[in-house]
Amino acid sequence: MSLTKEIQQAICKAEIKKGNHVAENFNYFFPGELDVISVAKSGYVSELEVKVSRSDFNADAKKRKWHFYNWALQYPLSQSCQTPNYFTYVCPVINGKAIISESELKPYMGLIYFQDGELITVRKPKLIHKHKHDIIRLLTKMITVNNWHHYYGAQKLTIQNREAIAANDEYLKEKVNNSIKHLPRL
């Protein structure tokens, strides 16, 4: 099992113990893919982003999702907010050194270290906005995405796209074969 997957599973177990609903690699409703999404009974959503290398952490700063977080901070009462309520980085401690330090974080970000199979909270995240998300809608989507991944190995649109491409390829082969049949022989 990869280190990322090991950390994701540890996060999910900890969040489930708190009574929250979780999903890994969730990419609906929010910008980008969330390594772990945790939905509390309150309707507040947490994004837990796993980083296992410095280059991964540095690349994260360039992602488009930060525009959405900045917007949520600027307009915290917006009902159309498409960002989680909390954000936390989770990284391993390797040879006694953490990949991310607290001083590198924005004020609202939380930080958790993963060391020797344990999660250690370094800093709790601050509430980004007070918009409560529709739990039924989120959980329905989480279950649907999980089912498609579990039973089909991909998301519904990916499967539908593959089927459409296969049907298109078959159609094109038939057209080419029919065209070749009608060519004059030399």
Regions found by a protein language model. Name each.
Residues 6, 31-34, 79-82, 86:
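Short, well-structured alpha-helical interface segments that form or flank functional binding sites
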Residues 15-17, 39-42, 79-83, 105:
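Flexible, charged surface loops at secondary-structure boundaries
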Residues 13, 99-186:
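Non-catalytic C-terminal interaction segments of nucleic acid-processing enzymes
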Residues 51-109:
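Catalytic cores of nucleic-acid endonucleases
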Residues 1-32, 39-41:
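Acidic-basic catalytic patches of nuclease active cores, encompassing PD-(D/E)XK
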Residues 11, 26-27, 36-38, 75-80, ...:
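Short, flexible, glycine/charge-rich loop motifs used to bind or transfer phosphoryl groups or to couple energy/partner
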Residues 34-47, 51-53:
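Active-site beta-strand-loop-beta-strand hairpin of nuclease catalytic cores
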